[in-house]
Amino acid sequence: MSKKPVMLMILDGFGISPNKEGNAVAAANKPNYDRLFNKYPHTELQASGLEVGLPEGQMGNSEVGHLNIGAGRIIYQELTRITKEIKEGTFFTNKALVKAMDEAKENNTSLHLMGLLSNGGVHSHIDHLKGLLELAKKKGLQKVYVHAFMDGRDVAPSSGKEFIVELENAMKEIGVGEIATISGRYYAMDRDNRWERVELAYNAMVLGEGEKASSAVEAIEKSYHDNKTDEFVLPTVIEEDGHPVSRIKDGDSVIFFNFRPDRAREITRAIVDPEFKGFERKQLHVNFVCMTQYDKTLECVDVAYRPENYTNTLGEYVASKGLNQLRIAETEKYAHVTFFFNGGVEQPNTNEDRALIASPKVATYDLKPEMSAYEVTDELIKRLDEDKYDMIILNFANPDMVGHTGVQEAAVKAIEAVDECLGKVADKVLEKEGTLFITADHGNAEVMIDYSTGKPMTAHTSDPVPFLWISKDAEGKSLKDGGKLADIAPTMLTVMGLEVPSEMTGTCLLNK
């Protein structure tokens, strides 16, 4: 007998904006999406700020989006949690942070603070770095060095100089800290095992090798002069009198202040993992603190903020009812439909199958805007024909990953490719008498230019996202307005005929 699958399709980075200028979502020719939008119930969901557990006005991101969708409740993000603790003062008694600083003081070694220097709030926040500098000052440390990873992706592409100036002013005011290296996140925060990139960032921080400059401002200005925006700043060692200001040495304490794990793992492993094979390097012995748990298997680090456990996430609850589920995405978003969707748990649920389709190996995705969407679709259709799954979670990475390049024509092509795939998937789900929900985790591709400067915009947005309910049963019905990402899971469970568990505080969006 054919199963009637309930499927959630997440169009990563596909937001809704009334402004047509620089809007790749509006500019794209998307007959399938438009046809479904006009025929079936739809509404808009909030995917940013307080509605997803972020500070007010903070744009959403993929990790936060998938956590909220999978949990069926608002998940207070690490950003909000850490910022709140700094304000309330508990940050300054955090065991792991205090221990790292005490050890540096007792052993008369250096403290290194490494991480993404911006207020983007996706991977890190400059205010958390300032909090660490204040704690170092309170502890009476003098040898405190910052290894700044330049952003230009979650914030404007050439805003790095302003953040360097802001950091230098803060260090002056607090009375501690010097910038030792700067590296574009393209090198320091790779997540695709491109070790030749990571090695350059590592060499700057640990060996004092790489580009040279006499100040961080000089380094970033040179990068701009060479037409390299923040993300692509070559790892640069800041020198005083011809010697590196500092480098990470045995016995030093290191605090990595990024709170998002996926782009923090590789450089962390390069520094601390005794089994590391990415490139040739000598084993360092440092006191290393990760702001959050980057990877359970990293045993040689301390963690400042351990993960909170969420019970009865959508996947866990569906598994507890003896149902089969599938998660499918290409490499770039695979962690999002598995680890993040399951509330930060690596282990698959019982009867949870996973399909990983390799992302194309290109330098930037504007060179291949269709990415692996067609391959993902082919695999999904094959799986649907097996009639095995009660619930399917699918992510199309294109609008987000191509949106991040800032190239509007490519983003338009990305959305057109996804539309083609979306049409095939919708037809197949309807043929199986199933239900398809279409949504996004946050906005991106609907704003491809910075309206204030006219330059390309590479960051996420705070725009709402669509939510479509596609099924034979949905025709002529309607969805509630004013929803948020956390309302998706209760809605899906209702359609599946399951009771919504009490832990899910989201609301079902079906109008009775």
Swiss-Prot record:
Free-text cofactor note: Binds 2 manganese ions per subunit.
Pathway entry: Carbohydrate degradation; glycolysis; pyruvate from D-glyceraldehyde 3-phosphate: step 3/5
Coiled-coil spans in chain: none
CDD domains tied to this protein: iPGM (cd16010)
Any one GO BP annotation for this protein: glucose catabolic process
Reactions performed catalytically: (2R)-2-phosphoglycerate = (2R)-3-phosphoglycerate
Matching InterPro entries: Alkaline_phosphatase_core_sf (IPR017850), BPG-indep_PGM_N (IPR011258), Metalloenzyme (IPR006124), PGAM_B_sf (IPR036646), Pgm_bpd_ind (IPR005995)
Residues bound to Mn(2+) 2: 12, 62, 441-442
Transmembrane regions: none
UniProt EC number: 5.4.2.12
Binding-site positions, Mn(2+) 1: 400, 404, 460
Residues the record marks as active site: 62
Statement: the UniProt record of this protein carries the keyword Phosphoprotein: no
GO CC annotation: cytosol
Family named by the database record: Belongs to the BPG-independent phosphoglycerate mutase family.
Function of the molecule: Catalyzes the interconversion of 2-phosphoglycerate and 3-phosphoglycerate.
Xref: PANTHER family: 2,3-BISPHOSPHOGLYCERATE-INDEPENDENT PHOSPHOGLYCERATE MUTASE
UniProt name for this protein: 2,3-bisphosphoglycerate-independent phosphoglycerate mutase
